[in-house]
Structures are given as C-alpha cells and as structure tokens.
Regions:
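Short cysteine-rich clusters marking metal-coordination/redox-active sites
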Residues: 18-21, 36-39, 276
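A glycine-rich helix->loop->beta "capping" turn
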Residues: 106-110, 128-139, 151, 209
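Residues immediately within or flanking Cys/His clusters that coordinate Zn2+
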Residues: 15-18, 33, 57
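Canonical Rossmann dinucleotide-binding motif of NAD(H)/NADP(H)-dependent dehydrogenases/reductases
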Residues: 44-86
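Cysteine-rich micro-motifs
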Residues: 29-42
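Catalytic loop of short-chain dehydrogenase/reductase
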Residues: 142-249, 254-257, 261-320, 328-347
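Conserved Rossmann-fold cofactor-binding substructure of NAD(P)-dependent oxidoreductases
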Residues: 114-132
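Core catalytic loop region at the nicotinamide-binding pocket of NAD(P)H-dependent oxidoreductases
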Residues: 359-387
Length: 387
C-alpha cells in the first residue's frame, strides 16, 4: 500500500499539466517548460509586449527586489518616470545601477525609503508624491513571510553610512544623526526605514545563530539566505503573533487603501486615463480551491485588497481611473528551506519568473493605453478570473 501511495505522489508531482490552462499536454513549450504550446506562445507574446510610456509618472511600492523590481525596470525601459518605495533605498539603487542600460533611465528613477508599518512614513511619502500628477499607482509592497531583524543586518552599513545620491529621496533628514540614534535607545528614536528593520519586536528578532542566517550567503534574488526550519508561511491560525498580524494588515492592506485614497487627486488630474493595480495572489481568492488554515493573515490581507478593487473601482472609473487586481502567479516558494514540496526535493524552479509576474501587472495598463477600459476585475495569467 505504501508503495502505491508513493507512486501516486510521484505521478502527481511529475504530471504534465499546463501551468495556465491546467490541461494535460505531451509536448512542453520550448521556453515555458510547464506550459502547453498554445499557452506558452501566448505567454511569450505577452512577455515581449511593450508600449510608449514617455511622459507617464508611476509609483511602484516595494520596488527593490523580485516582481516589484522587474515592474519598475520595465516601466523605466518604456520611458516612464518611476518612483519606487523600499525600506532599503541604497541597496535598491545598487540593483538598478547594475543594469546594463541604467544610464538610459537613471534620471527617470527616484527611490524613497519608506516603512509601511509606520503611518508617518506613508504620510511623508504622500506629501512628497503630491508635487505633480500621477498616471500609474502599483500597490505591490507586501509582507508575506516576516523576516527577523538579523536577516537585514548586513544591509545597515551601506544604508546608514553611504554618501548622498541624486536618485534617493530622503524623507527623514540627516541620516548620520539617525545612525547615532540607532543604539542604545532604538525604540524611542525617530528612525529611517532601514534602521527600523532592526527593531526587536518579536523573540525571533533576537536570533544570533550564523547557521540560520549564514554571513555572506545570498539567494537567487541577492537576499540573505534564511535557513529557519519554520516561518510565517507555515503558521497555523493560532500560531500567528498578534504583532505580525498587524504588520501584514498594515503593509498589505491599509497602506494601499491610504495611498489610493490620498493620491486620487493626482490620478484624476493626469489629463488622461490613469491606472491603479492592486497586486494580489491566490491566497486572497475565494474561488480558489485547496484552502487551509496556514498563513491566514496573508490570506485575509489579500482578500481585503481584492475587496478594495471590487468596491471602489466603479467609483474611480467616473474620474477616468481604472483599477484592477492582478495575481502575479507562483514565482517564489515561501516554505522554509528544509520543507519539501515533492517526494524528493524542495521545488525551487517555477513555471514562470519575475518578468512574467511583472508583465501580468503591466498588461492591464498596456491594454488600457491601447483602448481597453477594464476595471474592477481580477486577472490571472492575463485573463479575467473569478473572485
């Protein structure tokens, strides 16, 4: 019996079912190895689409790594003026600076250090952004797996000591003074976004084990390797710390609501159609099967973000603002490192990558500029999907 069950598991994980249409296929697409030929061709066409965004101004929250980085990069390459937010602006700048075509769009990029856990950070961001109209708002920033303070410690030196940079906008005044304030009374000081990552708010923020966060070891995204045996993606409902519940709701839901509301006047006065994209996920989808009691806090936050789209989009349409939600697809395995997805190994190579996720975000905008007037919809794999 055990052998039969094992064979069934192997058959499930080795099955050839298209990532998009979920139909069986015999021959995989040449580029997308987990798609049928038809879906692969469609996705490749979408991956390569572009439009002229010269004269457009965009705000992308969470633009330092992964999908947020790719989204901002594509907007810049299409000619847009782009403002990104991140807790670590110096690290973000280094990532953009490393791009081969950075000199072509350097003067169109602004990076702002913001910690969305702090309502004052959001307020300061809004005050800065309000200097001129906005065409595109992409609510991408999210906390899915909470990382402890030591995870970010290696970034602090550059963030607090680096010389001024024309691409980085500081909302916090003199950072050298903030560095002096960092210790020993960190909780009581006014900190910049990078320094706030070192606040010790939960027991995990006191981890000192180099075997868990090995110094100098980075993952495929250039981020600290995290070898914890458990993380918040695996938390059952009763295991979620109250503070983490608050952080997730604040970052993933409250911040997008505030930004959309407060930046409405800028979106209304852009002089053309403007766009709000709420970056969602299947965790927040009521229609999706296979729901369980893990990471309930992220599910709730994404469901709330979807409800923002459903309830506000018709109102925004009156002002020529087109709001939609987009599921970017499964790009990162959030399970803790030792966990296995299949019978033999942890899945690390996904069916799509960050560029595919970014193009899913940008697709409603590109089609909108081409004449489409979609609003109040959830898109998955470029198609409308049930809520």
């Amino acid at each position: 019996m055990k052998r039969i069950i094992k064979n069934r598991k192997e058959a499930y994980y080795n099955r050839k079912v298209c990532y998009c249409c979920e139909k069986p296929y015999e021959q995989a697409h040449s580029f997308y190895k987990e798609m049928c030929h038809e879906c692969g061709e469609f996705n490749l066409l979408k991956r390569q689409q572009r439009t002229d965004l010269r004269g457009y101004r965009a705000l992308v929250t969470g633009g330092r790594v992964k999908i947020g980085f790719e989204t901002a990069k594509l907007l810049l390459e299409m000619g847009a003026d782009v403002v990104i937010t991140t807790r670590f602006p110096r690290d973000a700048y280094k990532r953009y600076e490393a791009l081969h075509n950075f000199s072509e769009f350097k003067h169109h990029l602004q990076i702002i250090g913001v910690d969305f856990r702090n309502i004052n950070s959001i307020h300061n961001l809004i005050l800065y952004i309000k200097d001129k109209p906005l065409d595109i708002l992409i609510n991408n920033a999210a906390q899915t797996v909470r990382r402890p303070a030591p995870y970010y410690r290696h970034l602090l030196k550059d963030e607090l000591l680096a010389s001024p940079c024309e691409n980085i906008i500081s909302l916090y005044g003199d950072e050298k003074k903030q560095q002096e304030q960092l210790f020993p009374h960190i909780v009581n000081q006014s900190l910049n976004s990078a320094a706030m990552s070192q606040l010790k708010l939960l027991p995990e923020d006191n981890i000192c084990n180099p075997d868990i966060f090995p110094p100098g070891k980075l993952d495929k995204d250039g981020q600290q390797i995290d070898l914890r045996k458990m993380n918040s993606w695996m938390y059952q409902f009763e295991e979620i710390p109250i503070l983490e519940l608050y952080e997730v709701l604040q970052i993933n839901l409250v911040a997008p609501v505030i930004l959309t509301q407060q930046l409405m006047p800028l979106l209304m006065h852009s002089g053309r159609k403007s766009y709000v994209i709420n970056v969602s996920a299947m965790e927040g989808n009521f229609f999706a099967p296979r729901k369980n009691s893990r990471h309930v806090h992220t599910n709730i936050a994404k469901a709330g973000l979807n409800m923002l789209t459903r309830t506000v989009s018709s109102h925004l349409k009156q002002f020529n603002i087109f709001m939609n939600s987009v599921d970017t697809g499964w790009i990162t395995n959030e399970k803790p490192n030792p966990q296995n997805l299949g019978p033999d190994k942890r899945k690390t190579i996904m069916a799509i990558d960050e560029t595919d996720g970014a193009m899913r975000i940008l697709d409603p905008i590109i089609r909108g500029i081409g004449g489409s007037e979609d609003f109040g919809k959830l898109f998955k794999n470029y198609h409308e999907y049930p809520w």
